[in-house]
């Protein structure tokens, strides 16, 4: 008797689940758009029965306040600031060989690649907030104007998850549905991501694959290998614009790249000799010379505000650098 009751409950549960799926706009749209030669319907049914599926009502609110609608001055303060420049130089210092391997293979400016990684995820520090599935699911149900786009992306995402045996609820990304340290949307990930380290898997959170994928994206979207044309409307500008359709974004990428390039010239500088040079050539010390010292220290792992003032933090950093040298 107990077994019969249990069986009846299971039948009722499955029936309601089927009815819920048939009433689920996201399920219907994905079923229409997904390549069933690649992904079986049974897999889609299983995924849409996951109890972790939910709609996040704060996502439409986030879309109402995108970074790209900010003025250039506001945008610049967000993305070309001292902390991000320092983080970029530090990342470059720690991953220099990898950066140049990627740059050499694709013949793309290494500092453009670094800059995009910095703006997209602050070098892996900021890249998630919602599961990719739930973000796209929410857009389909709560944002009618984005339903078509989001359903295409959700179909692409499930194709990736099925092929690579990834739990669709296991990857978190942005409110828009981009994921990984390079913040690719699913269709772009499927199209442009590469297995740069040849381990057999394209990994959105492993730096070899991330940097390689960014470089590949740029080249596939108009970056002429070896180009030095950074002018507005040139091939580099257009390829970065393809990554994010915003002039502010392009200017931020180019601006941050130049700051990291400039600051990286101080890497591994001899702090003792530079201090000696400044003291001998600038008496008394002026803002320009102290700023140069602060940049040198930042390039070697310190985090100072470049304000041209020889304050306590700068002096302590100099002492620490000197003690390490001794």
Task: Label each residue range with its predicted role.
Residues 282-290, 295-326:
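Short acidic, glycine/serine/threonine-rich helix-capping segments at coil-helix boundaries
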Residues 25-26, 94, 288-292:
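Alpha-helix N-cap/N′ positions at the starts of helices
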Residues 23, 95, 314:
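Hydrophobic (often cysteine-bearing) scaffold residues that line and stabilize catalytic clefts
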Residues 30-31, 99, 185, 294:
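Generic structural marker for isolated residues within well-ordered, non-membrane alpha-helices
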Residues 38-285, 307-309:
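Catalytic glycan-binding domains that act on GlcNAc-containing polysaccharides
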Residues 18-26:
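Cleaved targeting-peptide boundary
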Residues 4-14:
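Sec-dependent N-terminal signal peptides
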């Amino acid at each position: 008797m107990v077994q019969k009751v249990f069986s009846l409950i299971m039948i009722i549960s499955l029936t309601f689940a089927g009815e819920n799926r048939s009433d689920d706009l996201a399920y219907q749209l994905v079923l229409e758009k997904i390549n069933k030669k690649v992904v079986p319907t049974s897999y889609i049914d299983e995924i849409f029965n996951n109890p972790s599926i939910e709609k996040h009502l704060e996502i439409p609110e986030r879309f109402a306040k995108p970074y790209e609608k900010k003025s250039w001055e506001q945008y610049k303060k967000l993305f070309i600031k001292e902390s991000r420049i320092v983080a970029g130089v530090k990342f470059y210092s720690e991953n220099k060989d990898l950066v140049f391997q990627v740059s050499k293979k694709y013949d793309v400016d290494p500092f453009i690649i670094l800059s995009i990684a910095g703006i997209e995820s602050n070098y892996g520090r900021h890249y998630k907030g919602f599961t990719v599935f739930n973000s796209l699911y929410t857009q389909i149900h709560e944002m009618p104007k984005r339903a078509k786009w989001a359903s295409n992306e959700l179909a692409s995402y499930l194709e990736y998850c099925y092929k690579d045996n990834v739990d669709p609820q296991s990857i978190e990304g942005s409110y828009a549905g981009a994921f990984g340290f390079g913040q690719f949307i699913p269709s772009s990930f499927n199209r442009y991501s590469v297995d740069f380290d040849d381990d057999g898997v394209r990994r959105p959170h492993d730096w070899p694959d991330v940097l390689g994928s960014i470089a590949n994206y740029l080249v596939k979207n108009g970056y002429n290998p070896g180009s030095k044309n950074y002018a507005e409307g040139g091939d580099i500008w257009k390829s970065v614009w393809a990554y994010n359709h915003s002039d502010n974004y392009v200017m931020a990428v180019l601006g941050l790249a130049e700051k990291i390039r400039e600051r990286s010239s101080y890497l591994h500088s001899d702090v003792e000799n530079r201090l000696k040079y400044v003291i001998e050539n600038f008496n008394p010390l002026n803002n320009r010379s102290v700023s140069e010292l602060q940049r040198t220290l930042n390039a070697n792992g310190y985090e100072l505000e470049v304000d041209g003032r020889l304050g306590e933090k700068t002096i302590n950093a100099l002492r620490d650098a000197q003690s390490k040298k001794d």
